[in-house]
Amino acid sequence: MKVAIVPFDYENNKADKMFKRKEIEYAPFRKMYTCFQEIGIEVHTIDVYDSLRNIDWIYFFALNTKWYTSLIWKKCENKMVYVAFEPETVIPFHSDAGIRLMCSYFKYILTWNIEQKKEGKVFLFQVPYFYRKGGNVSLEKENCLLIFQVTNIQTVKKNCTVNAGR
């Protein structure tokens, strides 16, 4: 089986760069690449393939209109899957209305949002997140900004002391 990926930030991630980047944000893609390879699925960014004829699935991690229109012209619409990797706060059209609209453009949609799941068209997937373990850093070494939100301003004025050293 062959899988092609249309990556987000296409220019910086083409030629399989998204699978080789060392930043922690790319850890899910590195893991996806190795897992696919282990079970015999060939996966590359779409620009690596010479021909799209033998590709089984094309995953869009971003809506790239250049590739979308090219693939529609090449009759690949039944191979295209959109992956709504980010929440709607990051990409606004990953909202419920946006996903409903995307259903008319893609054969399948993968989303992390359980409320957007629809039988036969929209499927759930678990987005892995990797965090760096933070250590104990003293406030003297760390530039620190604290925000306090209060609802009763009278209480704050009455009980607040100001640190003049800041």
Language model segments and positions:
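Nucleotide-sugar donor-binding catalytic core of glycosyltransferases
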Residues: 1-166
